[in-house]
């Protein structure tokens, strides 16, 4: 209703101003600004909804604050371009419409009415309401009900008798199991659901609506609210350190806790969370690649579900045989938005809806088949009688290719339990949320019936039953939940551990690299990983007076304030203000101790803008002084004009990538020498090893032969035509996820370059 009202007010404002208000520059600017704000808010809502399926929520702040890198970004480029073009077009059209009758005399009354209607349209828009609620949740002091309802469970289960298998189905919400809406979509897993305790009304609350948040909610009984933004949890060394979560209780009760997934464990800090709360055995993409049958059988996120669940079965079988009490948690990935992935072992690889194939539905049908096969293996084993199996979605599906059909239904998360010791079939329609999952499991295992804000749905009362406005209530508790982190509010002394790549201050530890925004009462960590914007881009958004401490590889800050370190991959510490003074210190000891020293200085706007402009230079445009092309740092030597066909820098160098260009091309500003040696330090990938690799300069071609290990080879060139471009053409680029960023499409690798040097040998 508010959406229709806001649109009606918007149109009324446009029409009244365009036809009645007349010409006045101030009123035109004010009205266009407010109407433009309405457009921006709604485009922001549309864009956020495209990613989350739930508008502007904490998932947007947490995952999309810094960058979409690592989130299958290629799939969103066209929508992003479309949104940008639409914004430009709408603003242009809006300005043109408002000035249609600019030659008419100005009328203050109609101008004021148009402006008030425009303000009303903004106030009534769902986007403004959502943003306002998020801002309020950041500014509240807390809610007195938090102390009443937050309960810490006993640290042990008195007499544990059952093992636990907990399966998180990525975005596998209960809505998919509605056979009337989606006939025969989930026959195998749906049949298993109907055999157990099926909780049909598991709602999603703020701070529980993406994978790591859903895991925290289900194991700790609290939403994931943190004292920082972005994916900073990937950089912390502990995760809600004061909380007692399900994993802690299981470990204290003698369980060995295992977690198996196909994606990288570091994504969004899952490894940190699990290690902080009782899990000693973690298996992700890196850990599995040496044990799976086919390491090359991967999708954009990691190993397919059939591979992961095969490994989970092996773990279950081995642990059951050992007689050791255990829990085995696993997380699927094939149903990840926007399209999902199809495991090759599925019997059904296609599901049609509305008369055409739908990739997301197909992925769901395939993944549920894999999960059901895993469960049926357990049920058929002699160990099922000692096992509880839990199947839940980590969160509701985000905006995938099935989302518009899901959104027509009453949407709930999936949560059902199969008890080997005590088979029980019942559908429970009690109102609940994902924070209740861990408490319900703990209750079945013989422990307390509460964890944090969660309550057992078998013997307790969920917050979803207590509060009609439970979403608003949880947001009101956000400051209370943030305080559970016990996060430092100041930094004076700090220690950089060069070997462990960590920084410690005020009792907290963070992974490097790291950027800190420091104010009088707050220290905000901003991390860098494959899944966030580079720290220099984040620093460029700081205000001129914002105090910062930046710990990163020296070459990344050298172009600004320490040119002598332009090729150093050591750690450096920079601090200061972008508009004031900055210092750079080289970390030259294993345990390097530093102090913050922020000086009150006069802000130089010109210096600030220069620093910001330099920080925003993209990697390929960075230039440094060197007599060779060093590939493990960003940019290129000053002599290089441009280059293509080369992937991002890694710790050892860079791969050629045929996705970016069929050949490696390095164009120099000036012609290469008439006669020179080309010294190449490199290695080959896959079938490119031990094969002739053409290297061309002008009309002359030499061949390079590389092995899988790094070697240095010198080629001799004559350049009578004064050519200025070096071309290397790997013969057999290999499509692979080797070393790839999680969620990105595979790269096509040919050779790995460490250094290329041109040596003039003209007499």
UniProtKB/Swiss-Prot annotation:
It comes from the Bacteria. Keywords: Cell inner membrane, Cell membrane, Membrane, Transferase, Transmembrane, Transmembrane helix. Pathway: Glycan metabolism; osmoregulated periplasmic glucan (OPG) biosynthesis. GO terms for cellular component: plasma membrane. It catalyses: a phosphatidylglycerol + a membrane-derived-oligosaccharide D-glucose = a 1,2-diacyl-sn-glycerol + a membrane-derived-oligosaccharide 6-(glycerophospho)-D-glucose. GO terms for biological process: glucan biosynthetic process. GO terms for molecular function: phosphatidylglycerol-membrane-oligosaccharide glycerophosphotransferase activity. The keyword Transferase applies. The chain crosses the membrane at residues 1-21, 26-46, 77-97, 108-128. This is Phosphoglycerol transferase I. It comes from Salmonella dublin (strain CT_02021853).
